């Protein structure tokens, strides 16, 4: 049986229908976008009212501050943005994180000769709290991380390295690649690492392990102990817990503030 070809009229009708569907889809998308924008504006207004009402608690309570920061992040608001915008004027968070950043730099500089420019987040938190005094605004580890990220954005050499269940804060512009990072993670348990331990745990060749350790020594991030039993131990002072309890001495403070 002979099939009839599709006529010009049918083609035109089909194109017209497609155009109408496309137009309708565009209208629906625009309506949906307008509705989402309206909801976002309403959420932002409610967030501003919430911040105004609870600003004292946001300033004083670290846990409350974290929750507020997370609420802001859901709509792309950055309360830490510099400048004299609504958030910095209302909450004073711009000044808070600027001052915290300065204090972080002071602590890292004072302890650099001990740890080579690497410090655990826990020790940094401990030293910052000691420096602030008991009447100062409380600070959480989350606050420290946010302040460090701001410092990192300024190109100051600061970085955050995940190690086990915590972080190492890097305050010197040393080049650390993935090999260096995994060795730091391996040393987290005992505070030191050996060539044999690296080879056994990471399945590396001897030369690769030695290159990484030599780099850490060169950058001042590791100490070499040739008197250790068995073979040389490479200590990571940032992970050497006996140093944590030592407060910043007057001499160390003078190195930062001559």
Swiss-Prot record:
Q: Where is coiled-coil annotated?
A: 27-53
Q: What is this protein called?
A: Vacuolar-sorting protein SNF8
Q: What UniProt keywords apply to this chain's record, in alphabetical order?
A: Coiled coil, Cytoplasm, Endosome, Membrane, Methylation, Nucleus, Protein transport, Transcription, Transcription regulation, Transport
One example GO MF annotation: protein homodimerization activity
Q: Which family does it belong to?
A: Belongs to the SNF8 family.
Task: Give Gene Ontology CC terms.
Answer: cytoplasm; cytosol; endosome membrane; ESCRT II complex; late endosome membrane; membrane; nucleoplasm; nucleus
Localization recorded for this chain is: Cytoplasm; Endosome membrane; Nucleus; Late endosome membrane
Q: Any keyword Cytoplasm? A: yes
Omega-N-methylarginine: modified positions: 4
Q: Which Gene3D superfamilies match?
A: 6.10.140.180, Winged helix-like DNA-binding domain superfamily/Winged helix DNA-binding domain
One GO BP annotation is: macroautophagy
Instruction: Tell me where it mainly resides.
Output: cytoplasm
> What exactly does this protein do?
Required for degradation of both endocytosed EGF and EGFR, but not for the EGFR ligand-mediated internalization. Component of the endosomal sorting complex required for transport II (ESCRT-II), which is required for multivesicular body (MVB) formation and sorting of endosomal cargo proteins into MVBs, and plays a role in autophagy. The MVB pathway mediates delivery of transmembrane proteins into the lumen of the lysosome for degradation. The ESCRT-II complex is probably involved in the recruitment of the ESCRT-III complex.
Q: Which InterPro entries match?
A: ESCRT-2_cplx_Snf8, Snf8/Vps36, WH-like_DNA-bd_sf, WH_DNA-bd_sf
Source taxon at top rank: Eukaryota
Subunit info here reads: Interacts with TSG101 (via the C-terminal domain). Interacts with RILPL1 (via the N-terminal domain); which recruits ESCRT-II to the endosome membranes. Interacts with 14-3-3 proteins. Component of the endosomal sorting complex required for transport II (ESCRT-II), composed of SNF8, VPS25 and VPS36. SNF8 is essential for the stability of the ESCRT-II complex. ESCRT-II interacts with ELL.
């Amino acid at each position: 049986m002979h099939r009839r070809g599709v006529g010009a009229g049918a083609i035109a009708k089909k194109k017209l229908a497609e155009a109408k569907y496309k137009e309708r889809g565009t209208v629906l998308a625009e309506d949906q976008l307008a509705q989402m924008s309206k909801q976002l504006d309403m959420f932002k207004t409610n967030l501003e009212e919430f911040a105004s009402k609870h600003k004292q608690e946001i300033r004083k309570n670290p846990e409350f501050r974290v929750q507020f920061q997370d609420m802001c992040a859901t709509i792309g608001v950055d309360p830490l943005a510099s400048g004299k915008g609504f958030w910095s004027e209302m909450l004073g968070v711009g000044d808070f994180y600027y001052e915290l950043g300065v204090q972080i730099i002071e602590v890292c500089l004072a302890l650099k000769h001990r740890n080579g420019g690497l410090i655990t987040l826990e020790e940094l938190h401990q030293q910052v709290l000691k420096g602030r005094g008991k009447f100062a605004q409380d600070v959480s580890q989350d606050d420290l991380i946010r302040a460090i990220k701001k410092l990192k954005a300024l190109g100051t050499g600061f970085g955050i390295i995940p190690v086990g269940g915590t972080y190492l804060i890097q305050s010197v512009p040393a080049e650390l690649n993935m090999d260096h990072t995994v060795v730091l993670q391996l040393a987290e348990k005992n505070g030191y690492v050996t060539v044999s331990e690296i080879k056994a745990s990471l399945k590396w060749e001897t030369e690769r392990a030695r290159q990484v350790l030599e780099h850490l020594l060169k950058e001042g991030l590791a100490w070499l102990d040739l008197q250790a039993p068995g073979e040389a131990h490479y200590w990571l002072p940032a992970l050497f817990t006996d140093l944590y309890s030592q407060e910043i001495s007057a001499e160390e403070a003078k190195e930062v503030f001559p």
